[in-house]
């Protein structure tokens, strides 16, 4: 499961997850479902957030009795649990790449700031979605300059106002393989973003929310997966209850 669990719509008695610009909420019905499921399934959270960005959610879940078997953070660049992380590409020199980009930054680029909480990839945050959309291809062009740049083999993608620079072979599916081995393919999982397609296409039972990205919906339907009839807190609650019924 990924950040699909969290939504920005406030709800009574929710677990509040502070964010950089706004809070997210994990509904009580979602919490209750996760408690029950974690008693009979290995629950893994896979997210594009850093550990700093997920810590409040993970610790809140644990306080409420949810057992978490493992984490994939930074879009799969780092897996495990705090104190025992595995970095998928430990040879990367992200500080060197960051310094090189800063030194060669084009003044026509949209303004952005580096997110300091990411350790195993680079993440730049723009002020608006539109500026992030403009920034992403410029980052890609710069990162693809293998002859001049300090790091080869990178991919660039946008998630909201964040633009990621990460190893081209690193993603949530690769991270789940490191964490779970062959068991990853027999998993059930829910995601609603384009960075979830890489693993939703490989697992046994994918699921997503109403209103997700069209490519995600296509992948889940093609696999005979679960599509909630709603979005938001109600949608993820529906997915969890469907999974509970199927695993009794």
Where are these regions (language model features)?
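Active-site phosphate-binding/coordination module
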Residues: 26-114
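Basic, amphipathic juxtamembrane/active-site segments
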Residues: 9-35, 208-212
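Short glycine-/acidic-enriched loop or helix-start segments at secondary-structure transitions
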Residues: 8-9, 54-57, 82-83, 199, ...
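Short, aromatic/basic amphipathic alpha-helical patches
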Residues: 58-60, 135-141, 213-222
């Amino acid at each position: 499961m990924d950040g699909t669990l969290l939504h920005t719509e406030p709800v009574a008695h929710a677990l509040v997850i502070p964010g950089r610009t706004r809070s997210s909420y994990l509904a009580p019905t979602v919490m209750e479902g996760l408690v029950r499921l974690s008693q009979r399934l290995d629950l893994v959270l896979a997210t594009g957030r850093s550990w700093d960005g997920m810590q409040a959610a993970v610790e809140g879940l644990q306080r409420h009795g949810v057992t978490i078997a493992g984490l994939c953070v930074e879009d799969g660049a780092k897996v495990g649990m705090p104190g025992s992380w595995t970095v998928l590409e430990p040879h990367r020199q992200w500080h060197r790449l960051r310094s090189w980009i800063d030194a060669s930054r084009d003044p026509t680029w949209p303004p952005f700031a580096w997110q300091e909480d990411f350790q195993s990839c680079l993440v730049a945050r723009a002020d608006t979605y539109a500026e992030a959309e403009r920034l992403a291809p410029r980052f890609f062009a710069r990162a693809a300059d293998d002859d001049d740049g300090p790091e080869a083999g990178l991919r660039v993608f946008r998630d909201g106002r964040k633009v990621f620079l990460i190893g081209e072979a690193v993603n949530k599916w690769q991270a789940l393989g490191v964490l779970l081995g062959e068991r990853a393919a027999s998993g059930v999982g829910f995601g609603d973003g384009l960075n979830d397609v890489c693993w939703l296409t490989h697992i046994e039972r994918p699921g997503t929310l109403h209103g997700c990205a069209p490519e995600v919906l296509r992948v889940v339907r093609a696999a005979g997966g679960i599509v909630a009839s709603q979005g938001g807190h109600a949608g993820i609650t529906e997915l969890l209850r469907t999974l509970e019924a199927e695993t009794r």
